[in-house]
Amino acid sequence: MTHIAKSVGKGGANRPVDVVKIQNLINNNDSYTKLTTPLAVTGVADTALNDAITAFQDNHPDLKTSDGRVDPRGKTLKALNQYNNAAKQCRSYYPLWFSKLRLEKNFDVTRFLKLYARQFPRHPLTGTRQSGLKTLLEALVADANLDNIRWAAYMLATVKHECANTWQPIEEYGKGAGRPYGKAVKVTDPASKQVYTNTYYGRGYVQLTWEDNYKKMDTALSLQGADSLHLHPEKALEAKTAYRIMSHGMRNGSFTGKKLSSYIVGTSADYFNARRIINGTDQALLIKGYAEELEFLLRFCNGK
């Protein structure tokens, strides 16, 4: 049974994840749509899709109206799910790479950005938002340590939430004011003997806090000298370093002791409880929803 979150077709919200699902269903109902060739499954609603939905509604015996739209709990979706195609069985018209477990090197970043903008229109993907998401996607594709495309989906969902849709590493709001880790401390560079006054409040794609954690991440990532997070905590705001912190931390349980493999293994993904990797179950349901939609888009764009 195929479900959609929002309406598709004439006057619909036409979110790409939903559009792909309906395009696939339409192609499995050629006995009612009268299509001679399948629709291109693109994730973008167009006149061809609207006409096919209308034709399906006109020709299906259980449907009385033809408004050219499929609603999440409507009769048209129920009828589409009956799969009355010529072969009498459901076929997949998704891209061949849709089922791949890992992100591929030929991942279509440009296509993802276009579909993402349609999927999440409340936060327009312009300027630094677009460049930031592009940078993050390229880092995910290049990361040899990511064994599962679902890991990438949950990392993206986490950044979307933690960085408030900016897709840029950010500083903690309030810079630790009133918190124990928000007090300035003096640290000395062992090589140059230069003394720095630093405050170890949250920074990055995910918030790295406390002096000891900055030290530990230096060790984990082999950072020293000018690259040392302990000496130069502002380095956690650089995209490359912020990504390394997030990837290592989420894979190895550096933040809360919980890690990606605790919740996402093979084809199984507990996106709700995966929030425990970062912050208990705070906003877990919201981030779960992001992860599910982002996983679908990642899969759809995982090739050219």
How should these model regions be labeled?
Residues 1-134, 139, 220-224, 239, ...:
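Cell-envelope/ECM-targeting effectors and their regulatory/trafficking segments
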Residues 9-10, 93, 98-135, 153-250:
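Peptidoglycan-targeting cell-wall enzymes and recognition modules
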Residues 34-41, 65-69, 143-155, 168-172, ...:
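Surface-exposed patches in mature extracellular/periplasmic domains of secreted proteins
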